[in-house]
């Protein structure tokens, strides 16, 4: 496979696509790789039963998630962990791990995979050994339901799947993309398990089982009634009943049904008249696991456990049978035997023993995989091959029936679940080709109305080793950390206060006495808050797919691995005027400037330098100013140098300073000032002469420029036709009109004559104070 594209999600199945068995799927996105399940195919032996591991480099896998303990989902895990170049981490739920060890140990011992001879007569060494199983077991990590685990940017959460004890569906999130893998799941509440959950968060991709395609199950109570009636009628005629089951899972469900039925019909069946046996090498060990995890089952089981103070899985009418040597086969009996596919073990031995008699019954209660004896016998063949010598055939005269208690969803349950998930992309797995194809057609037909819209649903049913590529454009969300969080809260509070003031003021004027806090709250809630603008640094963690928004001062604390470099800009400009004139223009533009060095006493201010450096200063004719906090202006002779740290605000201020320097010698104000102040005198005389030439109207015009910048066309200044005529008795006014809010200003006395809005009044007063400070040296 090619390297994962940064925006492409890749699905690649190594097994379990267009087949049931050896489930194993690969997910790749943003350089992360997730492996789902590692099973074997019950119909095959040896290496042929494995997923196609050679088709993918397993060293790329970051994590492997096991959905449940069934062999077709977990049996090749020791092989992956011990016999391949796999280096990732493995996760499963607590009950799954508890059962996994015993189930796999029995798998190695019983099946032909662990100890068979090839047709050439050479010993098959097996896929893995008991030592491999023990070593792999210690490396497996467990997860709790509903807890989210983060592994280097891959987040996953386990939810109840309802298939067997410990079965989980996993919702995986990588860089904002969410994928839900159902594994085998059931939406039916049975006698001991809850139904599968619907995760609260939506998913972009749904990988869902399609075991039964478009088939529909009978109601559970009907199936239970059929099961008990068939078994009852068989044993009443002296027959024996064989139920091939997996050692764990549906076996416990059927035992709960039979134990209750035997208790209800104790006169005919109880008291040892018709014994029920649970034949498995792991019988007692398996049941101890179920007895341990009662509290992870449904309410009915937990209630029985609380009320009776006895474990529901301690059966009154069922006995455990470890091997057939202890079985006295003298009359009617019911036998639940593993494995469920009848490929080997106790169930196969009993099948060959009982199938020649027509009074006996083989009752298939689970899903039968193609290529297995369970699937073959459902065809009711006349003979079956012997497991010890396939050339010898055994007549089949027994009755064969199927009543499915497989904990898989039918079509209606699957469709309802898919609609609740509402994923735009659906990938079908774990189903034979024909049922899966029918399910795909049914889903496309169901979602046909969405075709061509933004909500169109895409359905895929890829074969093994066929890649599915999906393009996604994720939404990135940054997390604010550090001091910038306080800055955001501060800005929010300011916005809220301004909105309250702006909304409440008109109501106060209309009916000041009737204003209450409830009306105030309603006014604020009517309108959404404005966007808040804050400045900071966006740090991307590509490994964990996280974005942090923080201030520069917090960078070292939250990201110590990052180093910072501060870039300072420097621009030099030739000037052909005195420093006094430049200083005057700087004050006009910015109101104030901090004096760092003033050798020629241009500013009449004491330079702000450190005490220890005062003695080292020599008179070089420098004028150094600090403007707006970070911009440094140095003037020596005819050269002016501007230095600043790059950011949006500093760049804007620096541009303004450079514009002043480039035009200072030709500006009208400069010409007017210099025409009276270029003769030889000190700075005090320059100021006094300039002040004497600027009259009241000029002062107002300077201040009005601030209002024009702030309010634009909303501000109007009223002057005489002869604006330089000295008429001290006439008041010079200005008016600011914003919507229904109006402020009338007396510029002679620098005060507000009238204003009907407190927020507007505050803004105008601030501008009057700033304007007064700016022109004071000139008045």
Swiss-Prot record:
Binds 2 Zn(2+) ions per subunit. The keyword Coiled coil does not apply. The keyword Metal-binding applies. SUPFAM superfamilies: Metallo-hydrolase/oxidoreductase. Keywords: Endonuclease, Hydrolase, Metal-binding, mRNA processing, Nuclease, Nucleus, Phosphoprotein, Zinc. Its main location: nucleus. Its EC number is 3.1.27.-. Transmembrane segments: none annotated. Gene3D superfamilies: 3.40.50.10890, Ribonuclease Z/Hydroxyacylglutathione hydrolase-like. It comes from the Eukaryota. Changing residue 408 to F: Loss of endonuclease activity. SMART domains: Beta-Casp (SM01027), CPSF73-100_C (SM01098), Lactamase_B (SM00849). One of its GO terms (cellular component) is mRNA cleavage and polyadenylation specificity factor complex. InterPro entries: Beta_Casp, CPSF73-100_C, MBL, Metallo-B-lactamas, RibonucZ/Hydroxyglut_hydro, RMMBL. Zn(2+) 1 binds at residues 68, 70, 163, 184. Changing residue 163 to F: Loss of endonuclease activity. One of its GO terms (biological process) is termination of RNA polymerase II transcription, poly(A)-coupled. Component of the cleavage and polyadenylation factor (CPF) complex, which plays a key role in polyadenylation-dependent pre-mRNA 3'-end formation and cooperates with cleavage factors including the CFIA complex and NAB4/CFIB. Has endonuclease activity. Belongs to the metallo-beta-lactamase superfamily. RNA-metabolizing metallo-beta-lactamase-like family. CPSF2/YSH1 subfamily. Present with 17400 molecules/cell in log phase SD medium. This is Endoribonuclease YSH1. It comes from Saccharomyces cerevisiae (strain ATCC 204508 / S288c) (Baker's yeast).
């Amino acid at each position: 496979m090619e390297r994962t594209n940064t925006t492409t999600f890749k699905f690649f199945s190594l097994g379990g696509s267009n087949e049931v068995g050896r489930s194993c799927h690969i997910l790749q996105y943003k350089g992360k790789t997730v492996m789902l399940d590692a099973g074997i195919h019950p119909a095959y032996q040896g290496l042929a039963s494995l997923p196609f591991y050679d088709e993918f480099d397993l060293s790329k896998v970051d994590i492997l998630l096991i959905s449940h303990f069934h062999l077709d989902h977990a049996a090749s895990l020791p092989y992956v962990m011990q016999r391949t170049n796999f280096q990732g981490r493995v996760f499963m739920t607590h009950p799954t791990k508890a059962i996994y060890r015993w189930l796999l140990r029995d798998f190695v011992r019983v099946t032909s995979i662990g100890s068979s001879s090839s047709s050439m007569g050479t010993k098959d060494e097996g896929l893995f050994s008991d030592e491999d199983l023990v070593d792999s077991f210690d490396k497996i990590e467990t997860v709790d339901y509903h807890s989210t685990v983060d592994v280097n940017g891959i987040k996953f959460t386990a939810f109840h799947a309802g298939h067997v004890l410990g079965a989980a569906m996993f919702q995986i999130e990588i860089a904002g993309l969410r994928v839900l893998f159902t594994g085998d799941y059931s939406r039916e509440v049975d006698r001991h398990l809850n139904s599968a959950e619907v995760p609260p968060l939506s998913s972009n991709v749904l990988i869902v089982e399609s075991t039964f395609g478009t088939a529909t199950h009978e109601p559970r109570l009907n199936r239970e009634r059929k099961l008990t009636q068939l078994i009852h009628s068989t044993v009443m005629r002296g027959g024996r009943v064989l139920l091939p089951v997996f050692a764990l899972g549906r076996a416990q469900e059927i035992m709960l049904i039979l134990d209750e039925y035997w208790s209800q019909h104790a006169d005919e069946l109880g008291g040892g008249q018709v014994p029920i046996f649970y034949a498995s090498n792991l019988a007692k060990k398996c049941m101890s696991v179920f007895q341990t995890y009662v509290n992870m089952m449904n309410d009915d089981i937990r209630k029985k456990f609380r009320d009776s103070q006895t474990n529901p899985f301690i059966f009154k009418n069922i006995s455990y049978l470890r091997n057939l040597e202890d079985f006295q086969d003298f009359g009617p009996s019911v036998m639940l035997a593993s494995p469920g596919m009848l490929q080997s073990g106790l169930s196969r031995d009993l099948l060959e023993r009982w199938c020649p008699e027509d009074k006996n019954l083989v009752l298939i209660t689970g899903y039968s995989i193609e290529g297995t004896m369970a699937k073959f016998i459902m065809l009711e063949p006349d003979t079956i091959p012997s497991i010890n010598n396939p050339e010898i055939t055994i007549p089949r005269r027994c009755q064969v029936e199927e009543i499915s208690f497989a904990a898989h969803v039918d079509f209606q349950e699957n469709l309802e679940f898919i609609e609740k998930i509402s994923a735009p992309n659906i990938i079908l797995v774990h189903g034979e080709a024909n049922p899966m194809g029918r399910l795909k057609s049914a889903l496309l037909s169901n979602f046909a109305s969405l075709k061509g819209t933004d909500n169109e649903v895409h359905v895929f049913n890829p074969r093994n080793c066929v890649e599915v590529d999906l393009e996604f454009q994720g939404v990135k969300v940054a997390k604010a950390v550090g001091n910038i969080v306080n800055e955001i809260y501060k800005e929010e509070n300011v916005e809220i206060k301004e909105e309250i003031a702006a909304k409440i003021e008109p109501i106060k004027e209309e009916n000041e006495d009737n204003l209450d806090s409830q009306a105030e709250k309603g006014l604020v809630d009517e309108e959404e808050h404005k966007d808040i603008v804050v400045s900071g640094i966006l740090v991307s963690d590509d490994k964990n797919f996280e974005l942090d928004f923080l201030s520069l001062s917090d960078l070292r604390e939250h990201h110590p691995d990052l180093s910072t470099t501060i870039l300072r800009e420097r621009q030099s400009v030739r000037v052909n005027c005195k420093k006094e004139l430049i200083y005057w223009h700087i004050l006009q533009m910015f109101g104030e400037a901090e004096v760092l060095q003033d050798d020629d006493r241009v500013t009449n201010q004491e330079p702000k330098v450190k005490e220890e450096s005062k003695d080292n200063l020599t008179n070089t004719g420098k004028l150094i100013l600090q403007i707006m906090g970070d911009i440094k202006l140095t003037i020596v002779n005819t050269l002016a140098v501007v230095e600043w740290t790059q950011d949006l605000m500093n760049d804007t201020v620096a541009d303004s300073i450079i514009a002043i320097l480039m035009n200072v010698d030709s500006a009208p104000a400069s010409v007017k000032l210099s025409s009276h102040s270029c003769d030889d005198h000190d700075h005090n005389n320059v100021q006094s002469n300039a002040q004497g030439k600027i009259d009241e109207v000029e002062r107002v015009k300077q201040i009005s420029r601030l209002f024009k910048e702030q309010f634009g066309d909303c501000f109007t200044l009223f002057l005489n036709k002869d604006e330089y005529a000295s008429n001290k008795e006439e008041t010079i006014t200005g008016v600011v009109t914003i919507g229904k809010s109006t402020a009338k200003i007396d510029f002679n006395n620098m005060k507000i004559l009238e204003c009907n809005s407190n927020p507007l009044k505050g803004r105008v007063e601030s501008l009057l104070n700033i304007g007064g400070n700016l022109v004071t040296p000139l008045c």
